[in-house]
């Protein structure tokens, strides 16, 4: 195949350019503006539940401001799902608080509600205080067990900040993720379900909460004719130009989600006869994943071409800044890494022009968080060692999926 197949490329509706041109024609090329207002309204209609939405510069900013709004500060603890991207936990540290990591359950791969309650009780016993917030994550679009998580959170009166950055449009019992907890985080990075180039949003419970988030996102400027600041704020508002992209994207969001789900069905069909490879799917009818990225697990006894050399050339393609990776590693190995057959399959697919990547490395296994409290059961570590993400975006065709699965089969010994 001549072209390279990527995990999830941004797909334009064609309407984005008119909204962007409108911003240029009216000279609204700064943060805030008509596109931002309209994009927020589009998002509010999409998520429903009478929620309010603030468009922001990134999903990370949304996590940060949600934590701030929940009163998180110096010396506090926040429970965060360990199996996630670092943007779920890093903002906790921005506020001088400590992330406390909770492992996953095997059904959804997300925060284990039983382990969550154990963690809360233990933190109360050890510190004499409750954690200030709970952050579950919709990994690769899969809904978390939000009914059980909310039950635990309500029992201890702890606010929930849903990290639905990867789960835009995913639902549990027909309700959109991000609308169950006190706040919901969305991401519109270039590889997400919809994009604003870079950007995110925070789903808020009401208009008053939205105004408070907007206040902190615009440098916490007070309402005087001159610049008065009584609290520390941040430069987190979305550009009117980026919001124009978002408005165009909202015209095709349903189409995007449907395509990702369709690809999951195609992967299911084509991988059905492949022993040793398991596709992750909704555990029951209550779950409705957007399948942002389709993911598979490789059995430990599945042998793949090139296993013996799996980690010899990894860093060569990772360094250079194209994905923001600028630090060159001395060794390709760490104390915890995907199994050799997973890395070997990634390399085989890469040589065939197919992008794939391992699952997120759990935060409790990251060196930067080595000293943090963690409540683990081995689930996320096991998934990390066995899992691989496959191309799933709007530009991935039926022919592409057939080619991908065929190359996967060819790599198996």
Model-derived features with residue positions:
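PLP-dependent aminotransferase class I/II
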Residues: 34-41, 50-51, 114-118, 125-129, ...
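Phosphate-binding glycine-rich loop
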Residues: 32-77, 91-93, 101-103, 126, ...
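N-terminal "arm"/small-domain region of PLP-dependent enzymes with the aminotransferase-like
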Residues: 1-30, 391
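Helix C-cap/helix->beta junction micro-motif
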Residues: 95, 155-156, 352
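Active-site phosphate-binding strand-loop segment of PLP-dependent enzymes
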Residues: 107-196, 201-203, 208
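Conserved PLP-anchoring active-site segment centered on the Schiff-base-forming lysine
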Residues: 66-118, 318, 349
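Hydrophobic/aromatic ligand-binding patch that stacks against planar heteroaromatic rings
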Residues: 90-92, 152, 241
């Amino acid at each position: 195949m001549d072209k390279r197949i990527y995990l999830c490329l941004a797909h334009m509706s064609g309407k984005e350019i008119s909204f962007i041109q409108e911003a240029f024609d009216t000279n609204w090329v700064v943060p805030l503006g008509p596109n931002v207002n309209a994009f927020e309204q589009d998002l509010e209609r999409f998520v429903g539940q009478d929620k309010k939405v603030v468009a922001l510069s990134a999903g990370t900013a949304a996590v940060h401001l949600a934590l701030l709004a929940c009163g998180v500060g110096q010396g506090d603890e926040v429970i965060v799902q360990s199996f996630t991207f670092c943007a779920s936990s890093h903002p906790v540290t921005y506020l001088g608080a400590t992330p406390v990591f909770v492992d996953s359950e095997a059904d959804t791969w997300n925060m284990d509600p039983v382990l969550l309650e154990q963690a809360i009780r233990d933190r109360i016993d050890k510190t004499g205080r409750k954690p200030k917030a709970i952050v579950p994550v919709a990994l690769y679009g899969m809904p978390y067990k939000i009914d059980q998580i909310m039950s635990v959170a309500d029992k201890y009166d702890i606010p929930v900040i849903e990290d639905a950055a990867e789960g835009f449009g995913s639902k549990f019992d027909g309700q959109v993720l991000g609308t169950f907890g006190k706040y919901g985080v969305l991401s519109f990075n270039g590889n997400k379900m919809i994009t604003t180039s870079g950007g995110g949003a925070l789903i808020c419970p009401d208009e008053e909460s939205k105004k408070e988030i907007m206040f902190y996102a615009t440098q916490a400027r007070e309402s005087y004719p001159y610049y008065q600041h009584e609290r520390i704020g941040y430069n987190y508002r979305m550009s009117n130009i980026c919001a124009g992209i978002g408005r165009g994207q909202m015209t095709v969001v349903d189409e995007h989600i449907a395509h990702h789900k369709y690809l999951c069905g195609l992967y299911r069909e084509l991988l059905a006869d492949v022993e040793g490879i398991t596709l992750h799917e909704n555990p029951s009818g209550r779950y409705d994943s957007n399948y942002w990225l389709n993911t598979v697990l490789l059995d430990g006894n599945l042998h793949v071409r090139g296993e013996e050399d799996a980690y010899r050339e990894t860093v060569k393609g990772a360094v250079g800044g194209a994905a923001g990776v600028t630090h060159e590693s001395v060794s390709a190995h760490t104390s915890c890494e995907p199994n050799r057959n997973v890395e070997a399959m990634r390399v085989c697919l890469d040589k065939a022009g197919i992008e794939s990547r391992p699952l997120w490395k759990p935060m409790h296994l990251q060196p930067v968080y080595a000293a943090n409290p963690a409540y683990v059961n081995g689930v996320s570590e096991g998934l990390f060692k066995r899992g691989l993400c496959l191309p799933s975006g709007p530009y991935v065709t039926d022919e592409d999926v057939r080619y991908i699965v065929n190359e996967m089969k060819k790599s198996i010994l």
